[in-house]
Every structure is written in C-alpha cells, then in structure tokens.
C-alpha cells in the first residue's frame, strides 16, 4: 500500500505529464506542486514508485512517466470525475436538442464528444434488442400496397413496403392498426412474435392473407435491424499522441476500422458508471497504447447503447470521464423526450 505522500507524488507526475507531454523530474515536481518535502525525498519516492511499476524511465530521459499501472491507480483512487460547468452543460443540451432524428442525434453526439475531449469519439446506435415499440403506423399507398412504419422508444424509425395478396380496405387497415398497437406498443422487441401470433384470427378470410403479410414484414424488420451500428468521429485527434504518433497511428486506425472490436470495447462499459480501460487492459493489440472511456446511455434509466472515446493513455482522465458521463446523460434525456 502506497503512503499518502507517494500517492500525492504519483498524482503530480500524472498531472504534469498529461499537461506537458514531457517526462517529469523531481525538481519540476517540487517547484510546481506543494508536496511539502525536498527534491531528494521526492526522488526517493519516485524510485519507490518505479520499483513498484507505477512509473517508468523512457529511454535515457532524466524524468519519469506513468505506466498503465500508474494511470490505473490514478483513475481508481486519485482522479475523481470533473463535473461540467453550467455553461458547458447548457451548450451540450442546446446542441443536442437541435437534432431532427436519431441519425442526427448520433452524429451530433459524436461531434460533441470529439470536440469536448479532443479524442476519437465512438457512439453506438441504440440496440433494438433492448428497445421497445413506441408505435406501428400503417399507410395505404394503393389498393394492394401498404407502408409499414416502425417507431421505437429511442426514436428510431424503420419503413417497409408491403405488397398485399389482395386489396385491403381502409376499415380493415384501421382495425389492423388499432389491434396491432394495442398488442405491441410499449413492449420489448423480443416479446412481439408471441404477442401477434393470433392477430389475424378476428379478420375476415379474404383479409387474413394481408394481415399475415404485414405481420411477417414487421417481424422481419425486427430481425433485419438487429445489427449493431456505430458512428466514429474525431480521428484527426489521434495526432495528439505527440512524439509517438508515427509509431502508434497505424495499429490504432486499423483497430478503429474493425467494428466488432469497438462494439466489444463499448460492451465492457458497466451500467451506470463510467468504465475506463487503460493501455494493455484493452484486449486488442492495436489499442495497447490507448485508453477507452465509455458509458451506457438510454431513456428511462436503462442503457440501450454505449458511447465513449479512444485516446492516448496520456489523457485528462477527470475531464474526459466528466464529459463522457454528461453527454450520455443528455443524450438519454433527448431520447426520452423525442
């Protein structure tokens, strides 16, 4: 267990290295921070921190930098989450409230996260497996052609054309629309098949074929749109890796191109708190020089998707965690109100 003084030294090393991007020496630490001890004592503390693997000496530099282990202790014990200021919160809310649909919400969220954190932003579309049906609309386009519109609780809208086996009248259409919504509105996608199993029975024989076709189209839509989707932005921020940029950029970009890798990373976010994966804690080798900060978001207090950022391990953890958490909260509010 590290002493309180050595924890203060480690915190100072992390803060200085993040701020200056240069290895940190004992003289600089005593000048910049009120540690209450001499440079010689700080040197001894740094030697102990190095022996325990919390800091390391890069190449021949006289200074030290945090290791993954050092960053982990900093995040778990020393960092806390930096809250957003009132003007920042208002700016986030106003920007997100301008969205016109779900795609716009996700696009604005990506742009906002990248700007706030100066990292690569990754936002997962709300998962339909966790979604509920808000409404199913049926529109007549021709005597034997309908449009089915599925609207989810997260504001996602899916449209499908339905070619009917026979003409379908307005009265039958209104009846089907009412019966269908009475069964599925507010229910989870996974429950829908069982809920509509016998829906065609009350209809006249000549209409049952169309009702069955509509139900088949609805169920196919639920399956088709179950594929997970992501949006990424701010890859230009990778240049903030600094001196190591030429060495790390290719493997990081390759990892970011693999959607399954990103989905797995975001999937590690624990509800409701912020999850931080540092350096070699990331299973994908291409991301061993990065940290991933992620959190779930959704309406009604239940996460339906994840969002987060990817950046160098040398990141402002308190600020990044605060921004990710705040954006997730406001996105959830927007979805609940949409």
Curated annotation (Swiss-Prot):
Molecular function per GO: DNA binding
Statement: the UniProt record of this protein carries the keyword Transcription = yes
- Look up the coiled coil feature and give its residue ranges: none
Question: Which GO BP terms, alphabetically?
Answer: negative regulation of DNA-templated transcription
- Record-linked SUPFAM superfamilies: GAF domain-like, Winged helix' DNA-binding domain
One Pfam family name is HrcA
Q: Which UniProt keywords apply?
A: Repressor, Stress response, Transcription, Transcription regulation
InterPro entries, A to Z? GAF-like_dom_sf, HrcA, HrcA_C, WH-like_DNA-bd_sf, WH_DNA-bd_sf, WHTH_transcript_rep_HrcA_IDD
The transmembrane residues are none
Q: Which cysteines are joined by disulfide bonds?
A: none
Question: What is the role of this chain?
Answer: Negative regulator of class I heat shock genes (grpE-dnaK-dnaJ and groELS operons). Prevents heat-shock induction of these operons.
Family assignment from sequence similarity:
Belongs to the HrcA family.
Listed name of the protein = Heat-inducible transcription repressor HrcA
The protein's organism comes out as: Streptomyces coelicolor (strain ATCC BAA-471 / A3(2) / M145)
Q: What phylogenetic lineage does the species belong to?
A: Bacteria, Bacillati, Actinomycetota, Actinomycetes, Kitasatosporales
